[in-house]
């Protein structure tokens, strides 16, 4: 009886070890699948962004610049226009293509101020088109935003971004 018990325990031990070894392979496979899924998601972001911008360009109220930046004038202002190194004060809401808000000075209740040469290229270009008092919607392709790196955990690599921007004030660089 003891001999049968020892053999049964040895068999269970061997089966347990074999299943643990199999779990390591499964973990490796899971990691490879996650990396593969991330690559697909990154590629999909780029594809979805390009498809969105191509369709968006058909809208009569959307203007596309040579760089690929698109914008829509919601309200035209009459004040000063910023240069590439001027500091601007704005209210803005940034969204992903699915409508998820990732940042908003409007929600914080306080406008943001920054030099235009310290932001993403889509902002530097887009805000120079605006006059104080303007309200534009900017459609920024990933290469004019955060590109293949993304930003934080909300803006994935290759994400096209949409910003509603109100230009409140321009402080000219001296």
Across the structure, where does each feature detected by a protein language model lie?
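Cross-family detector of peptidyl-prolyl cis-trans isomerase
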Residues: 2-174
């Amino acid at each position: 009886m003891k001999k049968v018990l020892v053999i049964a325990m040895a068999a269970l031990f061997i089966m347990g070890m074999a299943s643990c070894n199999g779990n390591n392979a499964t973990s490796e496979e899971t990691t490879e699948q996650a990396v593969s899924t991330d690559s697909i998601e990154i590629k999909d972001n780029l594809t979805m962004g390009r498809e969105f911008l191509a369709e968006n360009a058909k809208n009569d109220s959307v203007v596309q610049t040579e760089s690929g930046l698109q914008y829509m004038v919601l309200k035209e202002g009459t004040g000063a226009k910023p240069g590439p190194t001027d500091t601007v004060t704005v209210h803005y809401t940034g969204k992903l293509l699915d409508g998820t808000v990732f940042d908003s000075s409007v929600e914080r209740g306080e406008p943001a101020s920054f030099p235009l040469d310290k932001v993403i290229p889509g902002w530097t270009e887009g805000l120079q088109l605006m006059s104080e008092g303007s309200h534009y919607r900017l459609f920024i392709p990933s290469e004019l935003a955060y590109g293949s790196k993304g930003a934080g955990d909300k803006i994935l690599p290759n994400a096209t971004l949409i910003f509603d921007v109100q230009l409140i004030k321009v402080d000219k660089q001296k």
